[in-house]
């Protein structure tokens, strides 16, 4: 199978998000923010996968841009979980770093596809 960096990274990140969700629900009894980060954090890879299998360039562009927006939303939920004390510094820094890397990759993809109109 051909390597696709964004698919690989977003899937690995989604698996970490699932573990974070389980931890937050089981250990911290937190159900609201955890559901939000589960939805957005797993949606990144789902949209990237759909984009990778798109039938048209327009569909590819749309799916990758949605993945980009979901990654930015996930970054926000990570910040809230950290600042509210639900996740420790080490967990936050590792996941935040991975999230920022995914955002940069998706920003580059969407910038190239949109002719530089993205951030």
Locate the predicted segments by residue.
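Short, C-terminally biased terminal segments at protein or domain edges
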Residues: 1-46, 50-119
């Amino acid at each position: 199978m051909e390597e696709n960096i964004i698919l690989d990274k977003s899937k690995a990140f989604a698996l970490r998000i699932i573990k974070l969700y389980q931890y937050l629900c089981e250990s911290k009894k937190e159900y609201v923010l955890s559901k939000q980060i589960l939805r957005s954090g797993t949606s990144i890879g789902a949209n990237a996968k759909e984009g990778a299998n798109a039938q048209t360039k327009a569909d590819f562009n749309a799916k990758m841009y949605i993945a980009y927006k979901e990654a930015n939303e996930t970054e926000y939920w990570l910040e809230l979980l950290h600042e509210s004390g639900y996740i420790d510094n080490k967990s936050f820094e590792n996941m935040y770093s991975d999230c920022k890397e995914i955002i940069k990759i998706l920003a580059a993809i969407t910038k190239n596809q949109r002719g530089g109109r993205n951030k």
